[in-house]
Every structure is written in C-alpha cells, then in structure tokens.
C-alpha cells in the first residue's frame, strides 16, 4: 500500500494536478513533490514554528512563480507539492525554499540556531539533500498510447478561424 502524504480532498489535488497551465509559448503540467528534513532529523517543527514555516514557504512559492498545491509539516520533515513552469529547475526551487526558510525561521525562533542542543550553533536548519519526485495526470501508458496512435497523423492541428496551431490532447 502506498502511503498518502497529502489528503487529496483537503487540497483538491485531483483537480490541481490535472490543470494544464499556460506560459507565453507553451502549455505545461509540471508538478514536483519535495521532502526534506531538519539537520539530524530533530523533531523541531512543532507549535507556532509550523504556521510560520508554512507562511514562509507560501511566500517563497509566490516569489518564485510556483503554484503551491499542498504543504504538510511533520515534526521531523516537510512535504511540499508545487506546480512549476518549464523554466523552474527543481534544484533551484528547493535551494531557494530551504535557504530562505532556514534563514527566516532562525530569525523568528533563535532557539533553532542550536537545533535543540545547549552549546553549538549550526549554520543551517536543514540537513543536506532532499527528495524530489514528479507527478502529473498523464501516465506513461497514456503517453506511449498517444505516440503510437499519432503515427501517420499531423503533429499539429490548425484552427483556420483563429490561425492558431495546437498540440494534440494527451488526456484521452
């Protein structure tokens, strides 16, 4: 059984995952699931820290032009689900979110500089590394079926009234 990290009904994920977004020159559906942990997997993310962290992440997503689909903060790890543009690199996304949230959280909660230890201060709240996975509404089987069905067909359809070309529909 696969563990669900996000409650699909709470976040309306089925609708959000299937939404195709538009940029100036393309249609896209790029969703990333990130997971990262505090240094030493300390159970520090509790109480008011959770609310402040969610606000920081929400603000950082807006600044980066990401659609925040879901965020869950556990005492010892964070799950973040975002929809990105094709120009957004997952490594850059997580670097900015981890760096910014570490800095801001430790300004608001100075006790996080010590990660719960009495003496030593640490330069970062988060452990090195992260998990990232991609998710979408189109399965590999759907893409393969679409490609095989397109043999001998034109790649683009042309709308004579609007003068627009459009790429075929993967969702069938």
Positions of the model-derived regions?
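Basic nucleic-acid-binding interfaces
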Residues: 2-172
């Amino acid at each position: 059984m696969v563990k669900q990290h996000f409650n699909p009904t709470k976040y309306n994920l089925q609708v959000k995952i299937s939404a195709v977004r538009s940029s100036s020159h393309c249609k896209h559906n790029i969703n990333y699931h990130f997971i990262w942990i505090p240094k030493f997997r300390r159970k520090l993310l509790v109480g008011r820290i959770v609310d402040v962290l969610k606000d920081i992440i929400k603000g950082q997503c807006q600044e980066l032009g990401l659609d925040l689909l879901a965020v869950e903060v556990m005492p010892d790890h964070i799950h973040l689900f975002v929809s990105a543009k094709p120009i957004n690199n997952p490594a850059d996304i997580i670097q900015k979110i981890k760096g910014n949230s570490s800095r801001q959280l430790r300004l608001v909660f100075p006790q996080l500089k010590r990660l719960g230890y009495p003496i030593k201060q640490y330069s970062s709240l988060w452990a090195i590394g992260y998990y990232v996975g991609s998710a979408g509404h189109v399965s590999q089987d759907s893409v393969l079926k679409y490609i095989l069905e397109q043999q001998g067909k034109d790649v683009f359809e042309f709308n004579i009234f609007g003068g627009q070309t459009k790429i075929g529909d993967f969702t069938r």
